[in-house]
A protein has these predicted regions:
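Cys-nucleophile CN-hydrolase/nitrilase-fold catalytic domain and related Cys-dependent amidase chemistry
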Residues: 1-75, 81, 143-163
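Active-site catalytic loop in hydrolytic enzyme cores
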Residues: 32, 42, 60-134, 139-152, ...
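Short beta->alpha transition motifs characteristic of CBS
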Residues: 17, 70, 82-88, 184, ...
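Short helix-loop capping/hinge motifs at secondary-structure junctions, enriched
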Residues: 77-80, 191-193, 221-222
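A short, polar/charged loop-to-alpha-helix boundary motif
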Residues: 84-97, 199-227
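CN hydrolase (nitrilase-like) catalytic-core segments centered on the catalytic cysteine
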Residues: 32-52, 110, 120-213
Length: 246
């Protein structure tokens, strides 16, 4: 990818550990910044790119773990940390929920970070967009048996918000879960700019590792937001139930 002079690279969720680790998450968790972040930041500096990747992070209190998305920049510095807000299943026993949705202004565009199951909640993408995001990066470990959800959510969030979605989804297997791959870049009208959907094993049909590169034009975001008015025509005064605690 670096040979094609890319500006932004996105990796899947929890790339330094795997997904089904239970108590072993505590062993593999690192502080941020720490050895893994520093190593990837060095690579970002070496190739002059932004890198977003998922890992297990921990606070000074050793028992407090987060499922995190880390962004490092071309200057080799830590840019942002996002801790996954929407945890599902056994994640809830391993991780603490995050509580902030950071938006990062960069010279390549304004970027928001999401992780996996966050994608199922339209409020996350909309909140990031209302705070200025033009590109939403999603680090994911989406299961193969639910891959239609992944594809639908990625396109839906792009349509709803007239933004670019950059989603990296894991392939392979953990203890009981098979992951669905199909990483993709989706444009503000739901058009798929690039996808790894066809990167499959010829015998089993299972998704394979790979990477895809797309060139995007942020003028499309401004054009379609002006044309379709998804943001301007909102009526937030009638959406009170969205923020009511049930």
């Amino acid at each position: 990818a670096s040979q094609q002079k890319v500006d932004l690279i996105v990796f899947p969720e929890l790339i330094t550990s795997g997904y089904e680790l239970g108590l072993r998450f505590t062993e593999l968790a690192q502080r941020v910044p720490g050895p893994t972040v520093n190593l990837i930041a060095q690579r970002a500096n070496e190739y002059g790119v932004y890198i977003v990747f998922g890992m297990v992070s921990k606070e000074k209190v050793e028992s407090v773990l987060y499922n995190s998305a880390i962004m490092v920049g071309p200057d080799g510095e830590l840019v942002e940390v996002y801790n996954k807000i929407h945890l599902r299943g056994e994640e809830r026993m391993a991780f603490r929920e995050g509580y902030k949705l950071p938006v990062i202004d960069t010279e390549i565009g304004t970027i928001g970070l999401m992780i996996g199951y966050d994608l199922a909640f339209p409020e996350v993408a909309r909140s990031l967009v209302l705070d200025g995001a033009e590109i939403l990066c999603v680090c994911a470990n989406w299961e193969a048996q639910a891959i239609d959800e992944w594809k639908t959510y990625m396109r839906a969030r792009a349509y709803e918000n007239a933004c670019f979605m950059v989603g990296a989804n894991r392939v392979g297997e953990d203890v009981t879960i098979t992951f669905g791959g199909e990483s993709m870049v989706v444009g503000p009208r739901g058009q798929i700019h690039t996808s790894l959907a066809l990167e499959t094993d010829p015998e089993s049909g299972a998704p394979l590792e790979g990477f895809a590169v797309a060139r995007i034009d942020l003028d499309e975001v401004r054009k379609y937001r002006e044309e379709f008015q998804q943001i301007q025509n909102r009526q937030p005064t009638v959406y009170k139930s969205l923020v009511r605690r049930y």
